[in-house]
Amino acid sequence: MHNQNDDIKSNIEKIKDYPIFHAGPIIRREYPFDNMEMKDRKKIFQSIFIFTLSLPIKIFSFCYEKKDFNDDLLKMQAKITKDVYNFLLDNFDFLNSFNEIIIYYDNGQNLITKILNGAFAISGLNYEFKKEVVPGSYRLFQVADFVSTVKLLEIKLSKNELSNSELKFVDVYHLKKNYIKGVNKKTLKR
């Protein structure tokens, strides 16, 4: 979450020469980072981390695994919708202090769009979906990608399921001490 009254132009200016950030391909050395050396990819990853920490933002993550729902997408959708709705209710006074909540989502997963719209629609909050969001156009969208990746790495670490490419990119000590700890400091408390 970012209050648009908090100017972040100077923060963005510091990383203006960096490419569009997408954490997974940076870690796995996939396009467009496939020809980049590890040290250069780590530099970009570290820069988006520092950028994230410098921002006046708050985050909250929801994490689910399909297998926990026996691959029943309707049950999963119901659970996620309920959790998002409860989050909105728990934080209603804070969220309602804004004239409007703008949701930046690229419609990458239709189910997520339905869940967000459903939960917000019954919450009583004034909201709008930003139309035609292109991830490369919004650094905050890229920050959300970074945060999601770190949260996923945190889950994989807790289950001892980090891949070889992830372990090669960032060791467990720095993952916990720097990235997970730093991202968790940005968490909006319920």
Regions found by a protein language model. Give the residues of each.
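Phosphate-ester processing/binding pockets and catalytic centers
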Residues: 1-190
